[in-house]
Amino acid sequence: MRCPTTWRGCARSSWAAAPPTSRRGPPGRVPARSGARPVGVDFPERRLATARAMQAEFGIDFPLLLGRAEEVPCGDDTFGPAISEYGASLWCDPHRWIPEAARVLVPGGLLVFMRYSPLFALCAPPGGRASTTLLRGQFGLGRLEWGERTEFVLPHGGMLRLLRSHGFVVEDLIEVQAPRPAHRDYAEVSADWAHEWPSEEIWKARLAG
């Protein structure tokens, strides 16, 4: 299924592999109920099957497309905002998915994405929990091999230059601090660590035009 041209300029879009398995509901739940026209894009098919099941559970319906963030099955200037919550922004090469985001966004469109922070990437061992020791150098940080998976975390300077090179203007960078008390620890980072240093961050960048 490809993105019909009738979706051009839609008010809200859940784009590029925003995880459909979150128990908060499908990524487009809130915009869909506010009258906007979200579109979900994810890969592989089993993740879309999970998203469809959650659409049924929450009583909403919007298009779900099978596709990769590096090659979104939609035309140029299709979406208003585009969102990636630990999908494209973590598991895809930013030198490929960011130019694709620029292609599918309308001029003035907003890109919002969440990812691991560079500091977390510097302090996290393969298969272990982030510590207070720097385990790798920041220069050259980008592609991280974690055994059976690969993730991408550019330093702040590299990400800023990449976004600017594709016409984006960064509006905000939110470094997320874990609350205290936190509701839980995670396998890759403790709540205490994430309270002292950001393990996650949210970027907001607008396409010029």
Where are these regions (language model features)?
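Conserved alpha-helix/loop element of class I SAM-dependent methyltransferases that forms part
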Residues: 1-11
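A short SAM/SAH-binding and catalytic strip from SAM-dependent methyltransferases
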Residues: 80-95
